Amino acid sequence: MTADGNDVTPYAVESDDLDYEKLLARFGADELTDDQRARFPDHPLVNRGLFYAGRDVDDFLTAGEQSIVTGVGPSGPMHLGHAMVFYFARRLQDEFGARVYVPLSDDEKYWFKDQTPAETGDYLRANLRDLLAVGFDPELTRIVVDTRDADVLYPLATAFAGDVRHATLQNVYGEPDNVGQAFYPAVQTAHLLLPQLVHGEHETLVPIAVDQDPHVRVSRDVAAKARYPVGKPGALLMQFLPSLAGPGKMSSSAGVSIRLTDSPDTVREKVRTHAYTGGRASVEEHRAKGGVPAEDVPFQYLSAFFEPDDAELARIEREYRAGDLLSGELKDLAADRITEFLAAHQRRRAALGDVTEALDAFRLTDDERQRARDAVGFGY
């Protein structure tokens, strides 16, 4: 899939300057309205436009029963971009009483990455610790690991694989390099439809980066065939949070992303050394011409998540534009806010103890597994 001549798939984003409006036209999604934003819980990711589009958002907002699906592939340590979406999902759970399903696609990383099972296992355990530290309600949350929960995911993926045609696979994802890659869209569909297969048909929302929308589209196509007791999952599409180095998608690479395990000193060093400011050539020029918040990564991080107070953010923006606040001072301010957030997250992370034991409360029950298998005809 391309936007303005640039490739955009779940596995490749070959542009640092995406035209998000053209992406919507190509993907067939709708821009969020002011009314929709107002009906979400007060949150900077929605209020300030990082979540900018969606599918069937009104249906989710008016539903009496709701589920959210948002996952992660264990390909490295989790970074701030991951954390923002998971903490947003927790906010929806707190405000709406929504269920949250979190799939971890360890199989995907074996098929798509040059990564050994042992490496994936190490990342998986670390990612699980970070997920549990978010503070989801275990009564309303299910964490699913593809290989550990294959007893339920494989029958679902088997059922859905027959509904994903090769032409669809090529059109949405391109030509797969191996059979695992060809099968994975059926696994992803199992992730996105799982809450309804367990609890019955109801509204489901997938908060997801815009490059991951192809997974949602395939699952909606499967649901639309009406062979199973599910409705089409909705989506809330997110623009990319830039890497510290500037425009483009944040990655898990050391040095260009802030990891959830980074120490305060590491955060400050990364922000001071790597954070792009689009800055002026000198302090004197900055004082005279001011900064450009739209190009400044530390400001964008504050706007997206780390400064929830609109009045305070407006003050920071005003002083930066006027040249009264220097780029280095803005970097220090952003680093302070990020380290405050990480300190609280890391305290919860350290207090968890054994991850396997902590995970038990979040796993699918035997009854839930059976209901899902029954729903697709593989309950025998």
Curated annotation (Swiss-Prot):
**Catalysed reactions, semicolon-separated:** tRNA(Trp) + L-tryptophan + ATP = L-tryptophyl-tRNA(Trp) + AMP + diphosphate + H(+)
**Where along the sequence does the record place the motif called 'HIGH' region?**
74-82
Q: Does the keyword ATP-binding apply?
A: yes
Which ranges belong to the motif 'KMSKS' region?
A: 249-253
Keywords, sorted A to Z: Aminoacyl-tRNA synthetase, ATP-binding, Cytoplasm, Ligase, Nucleotide-binding, Protein biosynthesis
GO CC annotations? cytoplasm
Name its cellular compartments: Cytoplasm
Predominant subcellular localization, coarse grouping: cytoplasm
InterPro entries per the UniProt record, alphabetical: aa-tRNA-synth_I_CS (IPR001412), aa-tRNA-synth_Ic (IPR002305), Rossmann-like_a/b/a_fold (IPR014729), Trp-tRNA-ligase (IPR002306), Tryptophan-tRNA-ligase_arc (IPR020653)
GO MF annotations for this entry? ATP binding; tryptophan-tRNA ligase activity
* Broadest EC class assigned to this enzyme: ligase
Enumerate the Pfam families for this protein: tRNA-synt_1b
Q: What are the EC numbers?
A: 6.1.1.2
Alphabetical GO biological process terms = tryptophanyl-tRNA aminoacylation
UniProt lists the family membership as follows: Belongs to the class-I aminoacyl-tRNA synthetase family.
Protein name as catalogued: Tryptophan--tRNA ligase 2
The organism's taxonomy opens as: Archaea, Methanobacteriati, Methanobacteriota, Stenosarchaea group, Halobacteria
Gene name as annotated: trpS2
